[in-house]
Regions:
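N-terminal [4Fe-4S]-dependent radical SAM core
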Residues: 2-61, 65-72
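Short acidic (Asp/Glu) patches
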Residues: 34-37, 81-83, 126
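Glycine-rich active-site/cofactor-binding loop and its immediate structural neighborhood
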Residues: 54, 60-95
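Hydrophobic alpha-helical segments
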Residues: 36, 68-71, 78, 157, ...
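Conserved AdoMet/S-adenosylmethionine-binding subsite of the radical SAM
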Residues: 84-235
Length: 235
């Protein structure tokens, strides 16, 4: 597979060597468990069924999960093993299947979800640096998009994530996510069923970047779009 799943478009044959994401073509999972520290409408009372994929197409310098994003953690999984992992999380009462950093495995994710057809909402929890072609491949398979929108400032994006085109790529990706799933919808218990939640982490000394991101959201996305503003930056 010559990989073009994300905007980096490495063109690397991941059956032979790793690309920027430091990941082979075979899915590697680092952790799968109920998680209670997502947004309240995602975690609810039972927890979110989080599935952490190894590797990352951004690898931000301030990453809180660097052991996972570095690509070395975890174990390889077949499609059947991934689906069995999903089953175990649902049996534990997970409100959803929360796929964390799945971008560089999106082709495998699409193939698995085509076969699996989850009984609970599927959350695509990503860094926002996405390819339109990849997102269109996921249409109808993802119920909730939970992207970061990290940067409107290309200099920050280059310095911290080696992605100077982040704003352009994330902007078009989030518009596509909104087209697919629309404004967030909750059930009677306040649990997310479908829609878009945009996350943004405020970076130290970069309030102007945050203002630009929020302005873009206000001017570009529908009224009622849910924004999760975060402050847990860790140096």
């Amino acid at each position: 597979m010559l990989c073009t799943l994300c905007p980096r478009r490495c063109g690397v044959d991941r059956d032979v060597k790793q690309g920027y994401c430091l990941s082979p073509s075979t899915v590697r999972l680092a952790r799968a468990a109920l998680h209670f520290w997502e947004e309240p409408c995602i975690s609810g009372t039972n927890g979110s069924g989080t599935v952490f994929f190894c590797g990352c197409n951004l690898r931000c310098v301030y990453c809180q999960n660097s052991e996972i994003s570095g690509g070395e953690a975890g174990i390889p999984m077949t499609d059947d093993e991934v689906m069995q992992t999903f089953d175990r999380l649902i049996e534990k009462g997970a409100h959803n299947l929360n796929l964390v950093t799945p971008t560089h495995y999106a082709d495998s994710v699409a193939r698995i979800l085509e076969k699996y057809r989850s009984l609970v909402p599927v959350v695509y929890n990503c860094g926002g640096y996405e390819s339109l072609d990849t997102l269109k491949m996921l249409e109808g398979l993802v119920d909730i998009y939970l992207p970061d929108f990290k940067y409107a400032d290309s200099a920050l994006a280059a310095e911290y994530s080696n992605a100077p085109d982040y704003f352009e790529r994330a902007g078009e990706a989030i518009k596509e996510m909104n087209r697919q799933v629309g404004v967030l919808k909750l059930n009677d218990d306040g649990i997310a069923e479908r829609g878009l939640i945009v996350r943004h982490l405020v970076l130290p000394g970069a309030v102007s970047n945050t203002k630009k991101v929020l302005r873009w959201i206000k001017e570009t996305l529908p009224e009622g779009t849910v924004v999760s503003l975060m402050s847990q930056y860790t140096p």
